[in-house]
Regions:
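Outer-membrane beta-barrel proteins
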Residues: 2-213
Length: 213
């Protein structure tokens, strides 16, 4: 679900040179390499490395649009995932914010890859490091997800994120724990351990390096 105007697309392409700002909006880009693409407790690429990256446009009013991609391996035709998303974030009170939006998860790689396409709507609430999100499956995909995460710093450079959730009829209950920090030169690292009731033969581990542009 992507409704970016031509002028915004042109600005987005320039973002590969670094984060830039317009009069009322900011465009940024990111790229990452991970040893294992994990989504809601389940590996999305058969525990193999994945190259990932995306672009984001955010207006000062709170509206945002973005696209993010990754290599995937589900054992079928799918080889590439592209997520198109948009939404609106706003403050409810000092330190208390909300986020509403839509995401299209689109898959490429073969004749039947598009059969895995999924659309979701989401509603999120954030306060004091806690994020509570509800994801509503749309179209033929009606599995809903509720997720709670908490992020905090243990030093000035090192952060921790703890997540629990329930992905109805897919991974069911899942959890993850991640620690992240800077490597230098604008490059960050992240180590995540995750598991789920369904969809994995073992606990998943991922080490990632990323850079925002």
């Amino acid at each position: 679900m992507k409704t970016i105007k031509t002028t915004v697309v042109a600005v987005t392409l320039l973002a590969s040179l670094g984060g830039i700002q317009t009069a009322s909006a900011e465009v940024s880009a990111n790229v990452a390499l991970t040893s294992n693409y994990i989504f809601r407790g389940v590996t999305q690429n058969n525990e193999d490395p994945a190259l990932q990256g995306g672009f984001d446009w955010e207006d000062k009013s709170g509206f945002y649009l973005g696209v993010w991609g990754s290599s995937v391996d589900f054992g079928g035709d799918e080889s590439t995932e592209l997520d198109f998303y948009g939404g609106y974030g706003f403050d409810l009170a000092p330190g208390f914010s909300a986020d509403i939006g839509l995401t299209l998860f689109k898959f490429f790689g073969g004749d039947s890859a598009s059969d895995s396409d999924v659309e979701e709507a989401h509603l999120g609430l954030s306060y004091a490091g806690f994020d509570l999100y509800y994801y509503l499956g749309l179209s033929d995909f009606d599995s809903d997800t509720i997720e709670l995460s908490y992020g905090f710093d243990i030093t000035s450079d090192i952060g921790v994120t703890l997540t629990v959730g329930d992905f109805e009829d897919v991974s069911d209950f899942y959890y993850s724990a991640g620690v992240s920090g800077p490597l230098g030169y604008g490059v960050d690292w992240d180590l995540t351990v995750a598991d789920a009731d369904e969809g994995n033969d073992s606990t998943q581990v991922a080490f990632s390096i990323s850079k925002s542009l």
